UniProtKB/Swiss-Prot annotation:
The gene is ccmE. Its main location: membrane. Gene3D superfamilies: Nucleic acid-binding proteins. InterPro entries: CcmE (IPR004329), CcmE-like_sf (IPR036127), NA-bd_OB-fold (IPR012340). This is Cytochrome c-type biogenesis protein CcmE. PANTHER family: CYTOCHROME C-TYPE BIOGENESIS PROTEIN CCME HOMOLOG, MITOCHONDRIAL. The keyword Metal-binding applies.
Amino acid sequence: MNPRRKKRLTLAVALIGGVAAITSLLLYALNSNLNLFYTPSEIVHGKTDTGVKPEIGQRIRVGGMVTVGSMVRDPKSLHVQFAVHDSLGGEVLVTYDDLLPDLFREGQGIVAQGVLSADGKLEATEVLAKHDENYMPPEVAEAMGQKHEKLDYSQQKAPDTK
């Protein structure tokens, strides 16, 4: 092989290797920063279309309603544990070691982000509560089968109550 051809081959192999290395590092970075959204039923039973369950140690987001009567606070720390459920009957325990949002209440919708532990609990690093009585995050509303519609205000006057 002449020196010119050898130099071209070396350059081509180095270029292909560099592109492969950059692509693999990029995919690894994207995969580690990916937060997939699951409902409690999907965590328990798997996704409806594929049956895929989240892996232990995977960073996920879970959305649903806080189960009434499930909240347990540790009086000596900020640690709190509560259950999140959806309309399909799935329920997941969530543990959180920080201050809960002011709007957090039992029976209301939340989205919690964290890591799934071996015992099936979500060790949350962030908990988001809904804004007002009508708001629900679109992912949670879609997963729970609810439909967002704009309120229809009529131009009629309210009847007198006297």
